[in-house]
């Protein structure tokens, strides 16, 4: 049986959401000389890259470092969290990016890892917030908040430079 698939955000919609999120980050961090943008692998990292590019364009005097955080999304406690490149977090401000916030388990585990690195401040970004929390975490900046049933699935597809969000 074929899955029903509804387009929630097309590429143009996603680009507008990313631009708005980048603008909100710029408003918050325009005075800072350095900012770490950490994307949760794989889609969160690709979104973080797009956000970092826009932030760097509008804050040319700031150093924007893009990092990829790898975590087992199905079972975050099963494997160690890794980060690349392995830059110092010490007393720095961090933006943590993921594609979808559902139960909060992955974002919570990633945030816990980053907080353990003696950072100065952290904000969280997600493209889609489903509002099905099992853990006490929130996204500071959200592209789209969507109420879904537990049985429905949000799929963020990134093909080359084209990003779309589907409800399945």
Put a short name on every predicted segment:
Residues 1-168:
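PRPP-associated nucleotide enzymes
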């Amino acid at each position: 049986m074929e899955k029903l698939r509804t387009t929630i955000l097309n590429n143009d919609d996603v680009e507008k959401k990313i631009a708005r999120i980048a603008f909100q980050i710029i408003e918050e961090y325009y005075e800072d000389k350095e900012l770490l943008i950490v994307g949760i692998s794989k889609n969160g990292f690709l979104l973080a890259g797009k956000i970092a590019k826009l932030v760097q364009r509008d804050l040319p005097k700031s150093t924007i470092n893009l990092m990829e955080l790898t975590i087992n999304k199905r079972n975050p406690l099963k494997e160690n969290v890794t980060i690349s490149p392995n830059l110092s977090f010490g007393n720095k401000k961090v933006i943590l990016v993921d594609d979808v916030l559902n139960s909060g388990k992955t974002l919570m585990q990633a945030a816990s890892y980053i907080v353990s690195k003696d950072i100065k401040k952290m904000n969280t970004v997600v493209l889609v917030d489903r509002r099905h929390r099992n853990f006490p975490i929130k996204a500071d900046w959200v592209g789209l908040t969507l109420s879904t049933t537990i049985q429905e699935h949000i799929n963020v597809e990134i093909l080359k430079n084209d990003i779309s969000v589907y409800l399945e």
